[in-house]
From Swiss-Prot:
UniProt signal peptide: none
Protein name: D-proline dehydrogenase
Recorded effect of pH on activity: Optimum pH is 7.5. Half of activity at pH 6.5 and 8.5.
Natural source organism: Pyrobaculum islandicum (strain DSM 4184 / JCM 9189 / GEO3)
Biophysicochemical property: temperature dependence: Optimum temperature is above 70 degrees Celsius.
Length: 363
């Protein structure tokens, strides 16, 4: 069976990985560098904690407006269909079925990363605490007690301040992990072209060529909006730097995540509703990071567009004959292994997970 995957980000790569394990012939269609749009992520994995994605809680618009007024967020892409879906989802609590699905995604992904690291840890995988500073720690502890995923948290100190310590976290080097996945996928056909349209089992490429397959998976982030999926691009910036840090932490008041790795320290920031190629806010990330870390050199910068649904939960569904996997927002890396497996299973004719379908936005 031949499966064409549109999108070579982390979820597209995991989809290809699982399809290949099940004996499928796979072709990945990606206009840029495979994994290129995913490298900007910090590499923080939060398997039992979803709070960072809860963008539809009633308090979130006020928080986002505060970020924008401080200059730490902006809106450049006005997708009125997405905004309309957001207003309908605003304040809506997830179903128990959704929480069960998310719990299963986290458990599966955790096992997958561990297994890959045990085979060869060439991507700096490490399970260690994540510190959050600049928050109301007491309130966060109370919130964690009510969390359906039962995250392990405690009070600690980081950067000379009181912090919430999330104990189930892990980290990896996104750059090194993409390289690892490409080695795992040696022999998979890579088509470095832009996909213009998907029609049933055909992918029409820029220039007029057509890729035909027995099944098509679209794992191309917010491009899924072409299929009527409510998903929007929230841009972020990632820097490999020479900064020094003892622990993995997020400075919430400045909107900066810091991940120390063996060869560099990753610094990331911004959550801009922005699908443009204007990357000028990246300077603000560095400014904010230097307020925390002092001066450092930048080795390189990468940009990513997090595909976010109005409720922050991912979608794995079929639209006609096409499998769509998107919408994991800030947790695409955390749930990448499991979402790739679900997308692969759908492409092979296996059943999906009802809670993760797009039907929840049509109710």
């Amino acid at each position: 069976m031949k499966v064409a995957i549109v999108g070579g980000g982390i979820i597209g790569l995991f989809t290809a990985y699982h399809l290949r394990q099940q004996g499928a012939d796979v072709v990945i269609i990606e206009q840029g560098e495979p994994g290129g749009w995913s490298k900007a992520a910090a590499g923080i994995l939060e398997f039992t904690r979803f709070v960072i994605n809860r963008i539809n809680v009633r308090s979130y618009p006020k928080r986002y407006l505060s970020m924008a007024l401080r200059g730490d967020a902006r809106i450049k892409t006005w997708d009125w269909r997405w905004i309309s879906a957001y207003l309908r989802a605003w304040g809506r609590e997830p179903t128990q079925d959704m929480w069960e699905a998310i719990k299963t995604l986290g458990e599966y992904s955790w096992r997958q990363y561990r297994a890959l690291a045990e085979a060869e840890n060439d991507f700096a995988y490490s399970e260690e605490p994540l510190y959050e500073v600049g928050i109301d720690v007491a309130a966060a502890l109370e919130e964690a007690k009510r969390d359906p995923l039962s995250p392990k948290v405690e009070t600690g100190r980081c950067c000379g301040r009181e912090a919430l310590v999330y104990l189930d976290a892990a980290k990896l080097s996104t750059e090194d992990f993409v390289a690892r996945m490409l080695r795992e996928l040696q022999g998979v056909q890579m088509v470095r072209r832009r996909a213009q349209e998907v029609a049933g089992r055909e992918v029409w490429l820029e220039g007029g060529d057509v890729v035909k397959a027995d099944a098509v998976v679209v794992a191309a982030g917010y491009w899924a909006r072409k299929f009527g999926i409510p998903v929007a691009p929230f841009k972020g910036y990632g820097f490999r730097t020479t900064a020094k840090a003892q622990s993995m932490f997020i400075e919430m008041t400045k909107g900066v995540a810091v991940v120390p790795l063996p060869k560099w320290t990753k610094v990331t920031g911004r959550f801009d509703l922005d699908g443009t190629e204007d990357h000028s806010p990246s300077a603000r990330v560095l400014q904010r990071a230097r307020e925390v870390l002092g001066n450092f050199e930048v080795l390189d910068m990468s940009v990513g567009y997090r595909p976010c649904t109005p409720d922050g939960f991912p979608i794995v569904d079929k639209v006609g004959e096409v499998v769509i996997v998107t919408g994991a927002c800030r947790l695409g890396w955390t749930y990448g292994p499991a979402l790739g497996k679900l997308a692969a299973d759908l492409a092979l004719g296996k059943p999906g997970v009802e809670a993760l379908t797009a039907r929840r936005f049509r109710r």
